[in-house]
Amino acid sequence: MIKLIVNADDFGLTEGTNYGIIDGHINGLVNSTTMMMNMPGTEHAVHLAKEYKTLGVGVHLVLTAGKPLLGDVPSLVSSDGLFHKQSVVWEGKVNPEEVEREWTAQIEKFLSYGLKPTHLDSHHHVHGLPILHDVLERLAATYNVPIRRCEEERAVRPFSDLFYSDFYADGVTEDYFVKLKERVQGEQTVEIMVHPAYIDPELVKRSSYVMDRVKELRILTESELPEGIELVKF
């Protein structure tokens, strides 16, 4: 039996995003999500997480969108006080100690709402940066949580055997889940990253990935899993 986690990123980004994720959970394949702690829809996401307890919720660590929770992290922000664009972060021009403090603050904020994280991942996959490997090791140990798999040599405490990020843009196809069994060999655990949402003005303002989120939601709520695949949580 193939064990499948369908994780919706960006919980908390906007209220429309939050509602899309909840719809994808109630009426579709979404069984896990990760919450952004520095976004306009964060408080709304917390409320929904407490209401829909069957949805596994982790923390979507942020380093490339919005403002940091801490004020004393100069290597993480541009002159406007916002996080750097992801291109800057991927160049490795961040102080790992500041990243660790900021990500710790994000996790602690999540915990302050009485929520328990199922796992950690990150916005734009920045937790895969080699210079942040030790940071991830410490966070995983401190909070006793698994972390989304990156490339094999950079995986830190992964839960899944495989991670697919290709249900995105042109990869959002009607038969994606039908063909999934052909891609997975044996009894493996697979995580698929998804981004369902309903469009609202805040989403249009904050993300370049908009229209395909609605298509994702439709496919996630209309698709059925092939025999031999079961949904599991972190």
Curated annotation (Swiss-Prot):
Keywords for this protein: Carbohydrate metabolism, Hydrolase, Magnesium, Metal-binding
An example molecular function term from Gene Ontology annotations: hydrolase activity, acting on carbon-nitrogen (but not peptide) bonds, in linear amides
InterPro entries (UniProt xref): COD_ChbG_bac, Glyco_hydro/deAcase_b/a-brl, YdjC-like
Matches recorded under CDD domains: YdjC_EF3048_like (cd10803)
A Pfam family it matches: YdjC
Gene3D superfamilies on file: Glycoside hydrolase/deacetylase
Residue stretches spanning the membrane: none
Enzyme class: hydrolase
One GO biological process term: polysaccharide catabolic process
Similarity section: Belongs to the YdjC deacetylase family.
Protein name: Carbohydrate deacetylase
